Amino acid sequence: MKTKLLVTGVALLFLAGCASYNGRGLVPGQSTAEEVQALMGAPAERRTAPDGDTILYYPRGPAGMHTYAVHVSPKGVMQSIDQLLTVDNLKKLVPGVTTTAQVREDFGPPARVSHLDRQQRDVWEYRMFGASQEPYNLFVQVSGDGIVREVLFLKDYNREPGGEGKG
């Protein structure tokens, strides 16, 4: 019996020490920035919003399919937590109009950035789920002036169950 309790206690301590993937347990309007970081770990990026909030970005990648943005008020209280990599957010990507700053705000840091020498453009890559929860790759091509030039949303056949070697 003592061994069982000891094993259970160690397991609970281990789980308590793990970072939360999506911030489960945090309460908007109550949880503090310190509690957010204690639960979710250090953010990959911090930005200051026009309203003075600090936005903490938690991409769960590079193979992950989610990026969470946690808004923290100037007083250090969490206001909201949002999953950014959604099909609805794709509507915000308008070639020739959307800026790289808007992409960073709406999608968070990319999983990978590559460069196209001939076109003198960068390609920001995100991995996410489509409307039917199938894996997709989002490629956002941006030019040197910081404007989105092309958006590709392609099904990722290599990440589908049994999809290795397809495509």
Regions found by a protein language model. Give the residues of each.
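Bacterial N-terminal signal peptides that target proteins for export
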Residues: M1-T8
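C-terminal motif of bacterial Sec signal peptides marking the signal peptidase cleavage site
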Residues: L15-G17
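Residues within mature, well-folded domains
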Residues: A19-G167
